[in-house]
């Protein structure tokens, strides 16, 4: 069931990351591990890094939603709707509150998925796919909101690798970013969490799916260049995972 977390919430998502992390260490023990997360995944990898940064060597945060002050309202609505309609209820109210602003920002394009990508072909593929653009369940939204809470909860961050490279990349026209000030705040939050090597890069003209934009090769090249430049070694702590 797309958009349903079966009651596992954010903890289940983070457990999945832990399992994959462990498997990668076992299969490729001599290679460094780079944790890359896009969109909701960017919240998940930060929530995971909050307690397990010693089990990775670099963190790349792509297309990250900025901290939303309306999150508590979303949590309250999701809990209320879940109580009344059940956890599998698909909330069009929360969907409108969460993504309505994204759609309105590009309403002149007359396509409700234009905020996804400036590349019209990619945006159309998104619209045509049954695996994209589905409405989350209340259960799914609760997981999303919890991941956002943990990702930005720098006061409870357990930074054990202050020199670990952290890279933020986003489209300059990505509405999930809200604005440049919010993007800069997200970058600064990671510094406040204890990391010394945090960089942020915005791509003009690109929207949320920068990995699918017409000039996507530039994004791939920049990320690959960043990884090679850092010459990271493998994480020393494997047994915790």
Predicted features and spans:
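Gly/Ala-rich beta-loop-alpha elbow adjacent to hydrolase catalytic centers
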Residues: 36-41, 45
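Short beta-strand/loop motif that positions the catalytic acidic residue
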Residues: 168-170
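Conserved acidic catalytic loop of the alpha/beta-hydrolase fold
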Residues: 14-31
């Amino acid at each position: 069931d797309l958009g349903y977390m079966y009651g596992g919430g954010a903890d289940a998502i983070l457990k999945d990351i832990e399992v994959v992390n462990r498997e990668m260490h076992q299969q490729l023990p001599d290679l460094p591990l780079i944790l890359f997360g896009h969109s909701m995944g960017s919240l998940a990898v930060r929530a995971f890094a909050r307690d397990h940064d010693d089990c990775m060597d670099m963190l790349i945060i792509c297309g990250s939603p900025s901290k939303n002050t309306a999150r508590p309202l979303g949590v309250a609505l999701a809990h209320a709707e879940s109580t009344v309609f059940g956890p599998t209820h698909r909330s069009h109210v929360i969907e409108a509150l969460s993504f309505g602003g994204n759609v309105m920002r590009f309403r002149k394009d007359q396509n409700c998925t234009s905020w996804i990508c400036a590349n019209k072909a990619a945006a159309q593929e998104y619209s045509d796919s049954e695996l994209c653009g589905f409405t989350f369940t209340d259960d799914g939204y609760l997981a999303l909101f919890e991941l956002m809470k943990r990702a930005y909860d720098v006061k409870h961050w357990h930074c054990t690798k202050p020199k670990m490279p952290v890279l933020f990349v986003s489209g300059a026209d990505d509405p999930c970013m809200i604005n440049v000030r919010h993007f800069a705040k997200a970058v600064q939050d990671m510094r406040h969490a204890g990391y010394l090597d945090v960089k942020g890069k915005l791509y003009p003209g690109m929207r949320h799916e920068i990995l699918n934009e017409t000039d996507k090769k530039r994004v791939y090249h920049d990320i690959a260049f960043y990884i090679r430049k850092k010459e990271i070694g493998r994480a020393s702590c494997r047994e915790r995972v």
